[in-house]
Amino acid sequence: MRKIILLTLITFCFSNTHAQDDIRSSSEKRAGFIDFYWSEKEGKIYLDIEKINEEFLYVNYLSAGVGSNDIGLDRGQIGNQRIVKFIRSGPKLLLIQPNYDFVAKSDNNEEIRSVEEAFAQSVLWGFYIEDERNGKLLIDLTDFLLSDVHGISQTLKQSGQGNYHIDPSRSAMYLPRTKNFKDNTDFESILTFTGTPEGGYIRSVTPTPEAVTVRVHHSFIRLPDDQYKPRKFDPRSGYYAMSYQDYASPIETSLTKRFIYRHRLEKKNPHASLSEPVKPIIYYVDKGAPEPVKSALIEGARWWNQAFEKAGYKNAFQVDVLPDSVDPLDINYNVIQWVHRSTRGWSYGSWIADPRTGEIIKGHVSLGSLRIRQDYLIATGLLQPFKNDSIPPEMLEMALARLRQLSAHEVGHTLGLYHNFAASADGRASVMDYPHPYIQLDINGEIDLSDAYDTGIGEWDEFTIKYGYSDFGPNQNEAHELKQIIDDWIEKGYHFITDSDARPKGGAHPLAHLWDNGKDPASELNRLIKVRKVVLDNFSMYAISRGEPISNIEEVLAPMYFMHRYQVEAAAKLIGGVDYAYKVRGDNLPLPKVISRDAQKAAIKSLTQTLNPEFLSIPKDLLKLLSPKAPGYWRTRESFKSKTGATFDPVTAAETSAEMTFSMIFNAQRMERVIQQHLTDKNQIGWSDILEPLYEATWESNYPDGLGKEIKMAVEKRLFFHLLDLSINDASSEAVKAMANREVENLISKITDKKANDSIIEAHYNHVIRLYSQFLSSPYDFKISQPLSPPDGSPIGMDCMN
């Protein structure tokens, strides 16, 4: 019996060894950073690990995406970036992610260990060791590579598209992009997610929406050496910050350490005022971008070399076309990728960085291909070009000018830079703002696009590159030099305000806006109102080409009719506004200051113009052209919404526009600031300074004839509904609720006393009174009417940093 058992064990061991020999001998070996074997017969990847406990960077990407902007699973999308290592426990290897958010930078090993053991780590996967020989451990990596590391199922679920799960029978390795290099080992897999589609987005982009097939790329990357020197973060510098908690910090210093994200760049000659770099920063443009797009992307990205020259470098920033042999996801290449979606959407400037230091290893830009078509559409609406067979060249030039700036903007993010949404107030001082085309009227009163978009890097951009990339000589004090750079831009009067202060509808900063122009938002709104009138008065069938359905005019009209929408947001922020900066103690930036009464009243006056029936009405001759959709065409998210079925609805268009103004004015945070500012200083505006001009433009003005009458009534109801909403909204302070209740009571009292000789006006008054009665009986159950949404606005041609 003992002999049988011994023979069985010998046979098993021999078979197991032979099996592993078969894996190595019968599989294709690919040597590189971490050697691996591809078994064609099994369809498996085996990783041959020589160094356990050695950290490396693990990144996943979506190499082939879904194609829906709303879902967000785009080609080239970067997933999680993690420092990981393999550790052994008996017959298993664990892929573990240490916790670099909490560390101890210390020579005391016990102090380091105490922090490591205080906070959780993450084991990403466990592998059984298939074979051990010559100091190498063989593991089967396949299941890991075919797992949902990118969180695709979760994204589909969160976007309302249904519950999807990986189907292993329809998933496999993708060999054309599974490669090995000296410093990175890359794998790619085909993943098929099966489920029942619940949303329209996934149906619109997938041939069989029950099976969504994408490709995921995995990169194991050698960590950079220790020669990179992190640069201190300053909130005024314009850079994104990386941070961690250092528990070995002296008690008198901050626990949190902050550094900027930036590429490694050094001068060959640090003593020279202008020197070539040791290694330039090179970006490569996707060959999939067609001409003239590709040339525009290259030209715009190359603008950054101007800023690097100001920082003391010669040819430090270069842009070329991506070679055929290079994978755009290869960690060794900074890439500007051309990404297609079914609808226009955001572009992204992302990076892969060393989580320990903030050193950017790879910049990766994703540019939405439909952006240029949106700018071309805007130019079409402005110029009405199809009267003759020849197309004005300024249309394409405007679109390409925007694309150059977009390329520069997104590359700026990958250099580590924040948005600067105050730059437009400083004479378009940065490509890191969101630019609205600057549309002018020439001396003949005709549209002039000659200065629609700026060219080149701005002055603010030069300051930021100096801060992030200057290589200071041995006789220079870095802290002093960095302070001097910031003091310089402060002295020159530039402004820096970023996303957290510019994006919220309740934002208070007078200069931090998206898609605006000029130093004074109210004055620019007045100017844009005049431009809009010229555009609408001249709008005709020449907005579409000969042979195109006349019903397509609607989509060209939409961005013209709502041309003012972003400047309305900018002007509204003056109400209850506060001018402030990211000041630190000891600098010359100003302390916060409430916007003057005159500036706030000017904003209210400008905004009130956008509520007049004359402003909101579409010219009669143009209205005659707006036709129901032709067969084979249909309304899209770029179209006006309608309450009249197939026909164009000018009243709903007007109501939608008015809602843009009211929703900004009656923001609960804004109205509370108005109360506080007025209580602090009686010279500041109060609620009456806002409501009286609005009443004069609506309930207290005469009703025009024709459609203007119903437009005015629709606007009046929006005002009424906003007051109701403020009175019960959880976001409203108690003071705002009280003031809103007071205003709506006074309004109802005035309406009750009004007499109307017109049946529709009388019905309008009675309806509002009846609605208020219903509201009083059950305010929190009362359903406040919501207007139909406008056609898509943002992005005109911009991004969202990941």
PLM regions and their residue ranges:
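Auxiliary tRNA-acceptor-end handling modules of aminoacyl-tRNA synthetases
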Residues: Q20-A289, A307, V321-Q374, A379-M395, ...
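Zn2+-dependent metallopeptidase catalytic core
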Residues: E54, E291-A316
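Soluble non-cytosolic domains of exported or imported proteins
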Residues: Q77, K287, E291-E299, E397-L406, ...
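Conserved catalytic/binding loops enriched for acidic/polar residues
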Residues: D426-N802
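Sec-exported extracytoplasmic/periplasmic mature domains
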Residues: R302-Y313, G412-H413, L417, P437, ...
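Boundary at the C-terminal end of the N-terminal hydrophobic targeting segment
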Residues: S15-A19
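The catalytic-center signature of Zn2+-dependent metalloproteases
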Residues: V321-H340, A401-I457
